[in-house]
Every structure is written in structure tokens, then in C-alpha cells.
């Protein structure tokens, strides 16, 4: 959790137990959530839905916390939620190829800014230590 906060997260939620999850979600957005992008699913999804605003959109992307979840019908129905699944498998290969080509064009044209740090392999230990507390960036390691 400390690393997420150090890297710019607006809020972090302790997943130790149900009370901590609910308290963390409530503290992070006292007015509730209009959009939830869920990479975890599992037992955490019901907590997120409980803190969703009426009419919220719930985008289900991953299942790091488990492939199944138990959501009560009233919690889902009374919130008028829109549940959308999103995954690479649902995106046609041509769309992915086109998006990647556009990304590369932006990179070639200098429209992408990447925060890179170059380091030598011999210096990798010191670089890793510095990255633990410094700003996030992509690391390029050379011999």
C-alpha cells in the first residue's frame, strides 16, 4: 500500500478484512463512485458495488482476487448499475493491431512522453533502491 501511495495513488484501501475494505472505500470517496474499473473481482466486488452511486458504471477487467463473486440481486438492481466486461479477447485482433500502430506513430512523432531512466547492469541494485522511493519511471538497463 505504501508503494501505491508513493507512486501517486489518490487513496489506498487495506484489504485485510471486510470492515477495513468498507472503511477505506468510504474514506476514499465519501460521495460514492460513479465509475468503478475493477481489476480484482472476487470477494471485493460486492464491497465496491455497495459504495457505487445510483446509475454507476462498473467495468470488470480482471480477476486477481478470484474468478467468481457473489453479488446480491438488490445491491445490483437498486443501484441501476451498468456492468460491462472488458478484456483483450473481446477486442478483434485488427483493432489491437491498429491501436498498436497508432501508439508507435505517436512515439515516432514525439507525441509520447516516457519517463525513462537508463542504468548500467552493474548499477542495478542502487537504481532499484532509488526507484523504491522516487517517482515511477521505465527503466532501461544496458550492459
What positions do the PLM features span?
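Short beta->alpha connector loops
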Residues: 41-43, 64-67
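Conserved helix-to-beta-strand junction in the class I
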Residues: 50-52
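Short, glycine/polar-rich helix-capping loops at beta-to-alpha or helix-loop-helix junctions
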Residues: 1-5, 68-73
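Adenosine-nucleotide cofactor-binding segment
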Residues: 1-44, 95
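Rossmann-fold dehydrogenase core element
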Residues: 54-61, 71-113
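Terminal peptide-recognition signature
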Residues: 4, 36, 48, 83, ...
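C-terminal hydrophobic helical "lid"/dimerization subdomain
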Residues: 94-143
